[in-house]
Regions:
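Short, small-residue-biased leader/transition segments that mark boundaries at the very start
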Residues: 1-6
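Short, glycine/charge-rich flexible loops or terminal/linker lids adjacent to PRPP-binding catalytic cores
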Residues: 35-88, 95-98
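A phosphate-binding catalytic loop at a beta-strand-loop-alpha-helix junction
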Residues: 94-107
Length: 173
């Protein structure tokens, strides 16, 4: 997705407000191309009198890779920004919560301490014991629906998809 500085800044401000006070933030793990929002979110937290275990007292903003099993992969140069660090997970869109679940598993695997979960859009309010703080919800999009392939009423009727949407954008078919 192309990004607009002003929109990303406003989303970061709203997410910061929704997350509220967090004692420690060392790292923001950005999924789905949310690095610009993540940088602004880090800036919002740094304005507070917030503690960090980072020596330089600034927040890391990192993005993982995904392996062939859709598991998070942090390279050796990124691992120190996760291991033993207080982490906020940030995603663009959360529909089922599966990506958040896998991401939380991955962050824990690499030794991170999850402090908060945020998503620009989410139909899920909680995942693995963490509130999912979001700017937009399903109620904000009249007629919004998401289905698994097995339960899709359009698929059952043979109605073809118009487009595919993911973290990179949408493509008409």
């Amino acid at each position: 997705f192309p990004t607009r500085r002003s929109s990303d800044l406003e989303v970061a401000r709203v997410l910061h407000q929704k997350i509220g006070r967090v004692s420690y933030v060392d790292t923001i793990v950005c999924m789905d191309g949310t690095e610009v929002i993540g940088a602004f979110l880090a800036e919002e937290f740094e304005k507070e009198d917030m503690a960090s275990t980072n020596r330089h007292e600034t927040i890391y903003v990192v993005s993982p890779e995904m392996n062939s099993n859709n598991q998070l992969l942090f390279r050796d140069n990124i691992k120190p920004s996760i291991a033993g660090k207080h982490v906020i997970l940030l995603s663009a869109s959360t529909t089922t919560g599966k990506t958040i679940h896998r991401s939380l598993e991955g962050i824990r695997y690499y030794g991170g301490v999850i402090e908060a979960v945020a998503s620009v859009f989410s139909t899920v309010s909680e995942m693995d014991g963490f509130a999912v703080h979001s700017v937009f919800h399903a109620e904000d999009l009249p007629g919004y629906a998401a289905y698994s392939a097995d339960d899709c009423p359009f698929c059952k009727k043979g109605i073809k998809l118009d487009a595919v949407v993911n973290g990179f954008g949408y493509s008409k078919l």
